[in-house]
Amino acid sequence: VWKRYLALGDSFSEGLSDPHPAGGYRGWTDRTAESLSTKVNDFRYANLAIRGRKMNRIIDEQIPIALEMKPDLVSIAAGVNDALRRNWDPITVIAKYEYGISQLRREDIDVLIVAFGDPENRGQLAGVRERLQFLNHETVKLAKKYDCRLVDFWPERGFDHDIFWSDDRLHLSSLGHEFAAKAALHALGVADDSWRNPNIPLPPDPTWVARRFNDVKWLNNHMVPWAVRRIQGRSSGDGLTPKRPEFSTISPVNN
């Protein structure tokens, strides 16, 4: 039973795009913490994840703080932002990941690792599928090597539908985060595997015209700003600080 859960990573673990009723973002890590808090007294949760962070900064900045905070459970998901960059260096990225995970495990901290899913049916990321496949494969290997809990989304097709994704087509929707949390809880051994087959009514597929309209809106609202930041060497996380930098209690949110 864990009493001090710390989340590390980028926008996925920060919770984009799952709005919290009280403001900011909730996300799968908050949802996981909310559930764990009901199973033990004096449960505490912190979250150091910041959107846009690449592997180097996650490991160099977040891991040392994590070690000082002395959690008994850490979740980490990282590497996608590296895979999206032109200067993708897979060997260096994985070596850095292994270093960070080994530091946590050396302190006997339980680690939950997320291996990202197959973007084959998600057109916006299909172009980097080979990179993400490599990242997934190596992440799974690290989880086994260091005896970590693992959520492996690669073989799961349940998240292919648009309903699980936000308008930016990169981050999960609130529903997507809900099922990601269920996957995490299953990996931790405190929930069943029903997340693999979401039994929810799916909306009808949009018409061709609606899809083209959404494509244009996505291009203007998300793709262009993202490209501009890349050209300018900026990150969406510049100037931001962690949303929960210290351990504190967390209460379940009524969905």
Predicted regions and their residues:
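Short glycine-enriched, charge-decorated loop/helix-capping segments at active-site entrances
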Residues: 18-23, 88-91, 126-130, 166-167
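A structural motif corresponding to the C-terminal end of an alpha-helix
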Residues: 36-40, 100-112, 138-150, 187
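Substrate-gating cap/lid alpha-helix
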Residues: 121-154, 174-177
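Active-site segments of SGNH/GDSL-like serine hydrolases
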Residues: 77, 81, 103-133, 154-161
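Serine-esterase "nucleophile elbow" of acetyl-processing enzymes
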Residues: 1-51, 63-70
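Charged helix-capping and loop-helix junction motifs
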Residues: 90-98, 129-136
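Oxyanion-hole/transition-state-stabilizing segment in secreted/luminal serine hydrolases
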Residues: 14-18, 41, 55-92, 118-119, ...
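Conserved catalytic region of serine esterases and O-acyltransferases that act on ester linkages
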Residues: 1, 145, 168-171, 175-255
